[in-house]
A protein has these predicted regions:
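Cofactor-binding active-site loop characterized by glycine-rich and histidine/acidic residues
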Residues: 38-41, 46-134
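Conserved acidic/glycine
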Residues: 1-62, 68
Length: 134
């Protein structure tokens, strides 16, 4: 790709099929996931999150792209790195964090932790351990 002044030439830019608004929303979603996971990592290090806490840092674009490609009625089930999926499908960050920290306001009333929460409303059916699940 040739560059002029650090930008791609107009002839090299590809139409993504998404509007500027959709692309901005995708960026905001990726940023939300990154910041959420950074905070979850801090809380885990401080002992506020028990059990395991498998972070989604570095994979934000994957789940946001997946959500952008889904059609009405599609459902998601994932492996143990699932916080990004929860946030990208529209689950409330406060509810997800409440679950991670074992509070009753969490999606599984604080009993599911990092890997075992779900939202029927958002068509998200949880994260599952790798043994025998994949």
């Amino acid at each position: 790709m040739s560059r002029k002044g650090g930008k791609a030439e107009k002839s090299e830019l590809k139409n993504t099929g998404f509007s500027a608004e959709q692309e901005q929303r995708a960026y905001r979603d990726m940023l939300l996931i990154r910041r959420f996971e950074e905070k979850a990592g801090q809380l885990y290090g401080m002992g506020f999150i028990g059990g395991f806490c498998h972070l989604y840092i570095g994979q934000e674009a994957v789940v946001v792209g997946l959500q952008m490609a889904q059609k009405e009625g599609d459902q998601v089930i994932t492996s143990y790195r699932d916080h990004g999926h929860m946030l990208a499908c529209g689950m409330d960050p406060k509810g997800v964090m409440a679950e991670l920290t074992g509070r009753r306001g969490g999606y599984s009333k604080g009993k599911g932790g990092s890997m075992h929460m779900f939202s029927r409303e958002k068509q998200f059916f949880g994260g599952h351990g790798i043994v025998g699940a994949q």
